[in-house]
Amino acid sequence: MTEALISAALNGTQPELLAGGWAAGNASTKCSLTKTGFQFYYLPTVYILVFITGFLGNSVAIWMFVFHMRPWSGISVYMFNLALADFLYVLTLPALIFYYFNKTDWIFGDVMCKLQRFIFHVNLYGSILFLTCISVHRYTGVVHPLKSLGRLKKKNAVYVSSLVWALVVAVIAPILFYSGTGVRRNKTITCYDTTADEYLRSYFVYSMCTTVFMFCIPFIVILGCYGLIVKALIYKDLDNSPLRRKSIYLVIIVLTVFAVSYLPFHVMKTLNLRARLDFQTPQMCAFNDKVYATYQVTRGLASLNSCVDPILYFLAGDTFRRRLSRATRKSSRRSEPNVQSKSEEMTLNILTEYKQNGDTSL
C-alpha cells in the first residue's frame, strides 16, 4: 500500500482514491481517474502535428487573402476570419505541448491557463459559426442566385463577421471564470480543461447551453443548407460548372470536419462531465476511466479543424487555387521583367474570374 501511495504522489493521483479506484472521504466518495502513459503522449503528438500544419496552412491562407485575393467577395471575408481564428489558436499550442511533455505540470501561471482555454473555445465555436456562414452563403448562391445578389455583398459579410466575433467572445467569456489552475497533492500544477469540482454543476449547465446554441443549432442549419444545395445541384443544369464543383467540395469537407472533429468532442465532453457529476459508484469507476480516456482522444480531434480548414480554401475555391499558383510562380520569377503592369494584370484577373464564378467566387 505504501508503494501505491508513493506511485500516486508521483503521478498526481490522489492517494485516498487508489483503493480499487474508489475513495471514501469524510462526507463524500468519488472515483479516481487512472491516467495512462498514452494520455501524456497522445495530445502533445497531435498538437505538434496541428501546430506545424496549421501554422503553415493558415499563414499561407492569411497571406493570400491579404495580398493576393483583393477585392474580396463575401465568402472570402468569412474564410479570412476562419483562417484568423485558426491561426490565433495554433499560436497557443507550444505552451500546451510543453505542458503535456512536462507530465501536465503547468508553469505558465493562472492567467495564461485561463487565456489558453478561452482561445481554444473561441476558435472552436468561432470556426463552427464561420463555417455556418460559409454554408448559408453558398446555399443562397446556389438555390436562390437571383434573390441573393444584394445579400452576398462584402459589406454584409463584414457586418456578420463582426457580429460572430462579438457573440463568440460574449458566450465564451465565462470560461475565464471556470478555467484556471489547481494544486495537486504532489505539489504539481494542473490547468483545468473544464473546471474544478466545486464549480462542476454550474459548469455542466453552461456547457450544455453552449453545446445546444453554438454547436447543435449551427449543425442543423448546415445540414439543412447542404440538403437543399444537393437537391438544387441534382435538379439544376450545373454539370461541370465551377459552382457545382466548389459546392460539392464544400459539402464534403465541412461535413467531414463536423463528423471527425466537432461531434465526437461535444458528445464525449458532455458524457465526461456527466460521469464526474453522477456516475460515482464503485461499479462505474472503470467506465469513468474509459469515458475520460475517450474524451482525451476527442480533444485532440477537436484541434484538427485548424489544420483541415486550409484544405477547404484550396479545394472549394477555384480563385484561391489559381491565385496561389500565380503567386508562387511570380515569386519564383521576380528577376524576370514584367510585360504587364500590376494594375492591368489585376483588372484582367478580376474580370476573368468574375465572368467564370460571379460573386460566389473564391
Curated annotation (Swiss-Prot):
Glycans are attached at residues 11, 26, 102, 186. Mainly found in blood, brain, and lung. To a lesser extent in stomach, gut and skeletal muscle. ADP binds at residues 35, 192-194, 272-276, 292-295, 299. GO terms for biological process: cellular response to purine-containing compound; establishment of localization in cell; monoatomic ion transport; phospholipase C-activating G protein-coupled receptor signaling pathway; platelet activation; positive regulation of monoatomic ion transport; regulation of cell shape; relaxation of muscle. It is a multi-pass membrane protein. GO terms for cellular component: cilium; plasma membrane. Residues 1-40, 99-114, 178-203, 274-292 are extracellular. The keyword Repeat does not apply. One of its GO terms (molecular function) is G protein-coupled ATP receptor activity. It holds the Pfam family 7tm_1. Belongs to the G-protein coupled receptor 1 family. This is P2Y purinoceptor 1. The gene is P2RY1.
